[in-house]
Amino acid sequence: PEDHEMTTAQTKNLTVTRHAEILGRHPVDSPWAEVPIEDGRNRVVWISGPPGTPPDPHIHPNFNECWIIMDGKTRYQIGQYEPVDAEWGDIMIAPAGFAHDIRPVEGKQAIRLGITHPDSNHDIKGVPPSRLIPVDTGLSSPNLIHTSMKRLLETHGTNSNWKELAVLDSRNRLLITHEFPGTENRRYWHPDMDKWWAVISGEIEFSISDNEPVTAGPGDLVFVPGGTSHNLMTVGNKPSIRITVTAPDIVHHYTDDPDAPAAPNG
């Protein structure tokens, strides 16, 4: 965004990008943006704005844009929809052709993770809507304008493992997973596709290739390049929630399947 000082993270696509480290690099009350991940489908932009940061309403005519919300509270007014206040763990979508006006409203800084097209720009400006209509009335996921983490926890509860497909479009699939400590998934790898996660709550241990496992917590991002085997386990004493970002047509090769090809990157 034009009104944010844009810095490229020291190294893009780190195995773990720590929430505390990125926030620690910038003054609390300043607008800034960093690009921690470029996965071939998306440019992922970590954006901070203190309340009062001027909006920059604009339109992307040929791709959908979405955001994972972190610290603070951010108000989205998308297309003709009524404004929505989004907070930690929520996902917002601006469908192609829908103007979006984004305003940080609460917290010392409001943090959002923008998942945008690599060639995104703000050249086409939006105008205020001439009327407002309710958001997502009577609709179910995926691809709600606003996926509320609070609502998901009320719907699914916290007494079981569950998954919710939040976004499925031509570029991305965003899957929300709630898991109990000790839950471990089968090890697999994906051809031709980088993959990453945003940890929303709890602690998750990521075992990637033959490297030492790494543990990530709330607000951290974890990145795995295509062709690299990995599996995850929730650790600690409380459930974890993560958002997994992949291509829509994801292919799994399981390492315990004797007929599956071996992972080229281990």
Task: Place the predicted regions along the sequence by residue.
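Conserved hydrophobic/aromatic beta-strand scaffold that supports enzyme active sites
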Residues: 44-48, 66, 83, 91-93, ...
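A short hydrophobic beta-strand segment most commonly corresponding to one strand
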Residues: 93, 107-125, 223, 237-255
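Short acidic-glycine-tyrosine-enriched beta hairpin
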Residues: 80-96, 210-226
